[in-house]
């Protein structure tokens, strides 16, 4: 509880200092220290901006390897957009419809007020969403499946399959084997998927729901289980900012 209160005071004082401090011309919109911590795990503003930029760069690299430039896509969805730190980096989007969705109403309200060029909507923690079937030809989801248990993960994979157009691309990040904290034997005993329920405290520092914890996958688990929902095009180890593994998927023709 003490560490929680100390963190809240830090949010308060940093927020006051930033409001009273000098304003930089043409500086990118940056959320409050509290929201930066929620989506980035740190209050440091430069790192927040840079990780968002690098994450989008990682996605662009994956698409380039598929010979699918960003201007080829008409409807793009950022599933679990948070404060839009990745989506905001899409610049060549005049002919593209950009959407960001998240279960966090606070971050969505911030995006709606501060970020332009995309539509941001709050969604329920449980699928389905209100979008029509096959609404998007590109969906990306950074640092979402890294925090869901297996049941929720499968529910949202099913929903992403419903939303993705045939031939569309889904790029989702996972905590791969290099990131795991458990011994490999423990992962094997758990069939390659571990949900680490280590943040279930009364005072949860990040302000996110209690079900939002830490999930770790092996590559073999993803290949065997996610192929029930999609055709797996590629699995790029450390493909997102040299940290998360990137799973590259497309919709099965039979669907």
Stretches with model-predicted labels:
Residues 129-139:
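A short acidic, Gly/Pro-enriched loop at the edge of an enzyme's catalytic core
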């Amino acid at each position: 509880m003490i560490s929680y209160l100390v963190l809240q005071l830090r949010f308060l004082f940093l927020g006051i200092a930033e409001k009273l401090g000098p304003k930089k011309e043409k500086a990118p919109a940056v959320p409050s220290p509290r929201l930066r911590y929620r989506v980035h795990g740190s209050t440091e503003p430069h790192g927040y901006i840079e990780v968002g930029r690098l994450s989008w760069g990682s996605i662009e690299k994956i698409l380039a390897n598929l010979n699918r430039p960003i201007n080829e896509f008409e409807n793009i969805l950022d599933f679990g957009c948070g404060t839009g730190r990745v989506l905001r980096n899409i610049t060549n989007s005049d002919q593209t419809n950009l959407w960001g969705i998240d279960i966090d109403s606070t971050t969505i309200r911030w995006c709606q007020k501060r970020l332009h060029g995309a539509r941001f909507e709050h969604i329920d923690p449980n699928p389905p969403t209100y979008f029509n079937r096959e609404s998007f030809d590109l969906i990306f989801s950074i640092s979402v499946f890294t925090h869901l248990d297996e049941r929720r993960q499968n529910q949202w994979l099913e929903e992403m399959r419903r939303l993705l157009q045939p031939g569309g691309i889904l790029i989702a990040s996972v905590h791969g084997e290099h990131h795991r904290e458990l011994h490999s034997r423990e992962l094997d005993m758990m069939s390659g998927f571990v949900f680490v329920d280590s943040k279930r405290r009364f005072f949860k520092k990040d302000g996110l729901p209690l079900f939002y914890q830490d999930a770790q996958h092996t590559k073999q688990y993803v290949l065997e289980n996610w192929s029930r929902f999609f055709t797996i095009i590629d699995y790029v180890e450390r493909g997102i900012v040299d940290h998360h593994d990137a799973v590259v998927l497309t919709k099965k023709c039979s669907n």
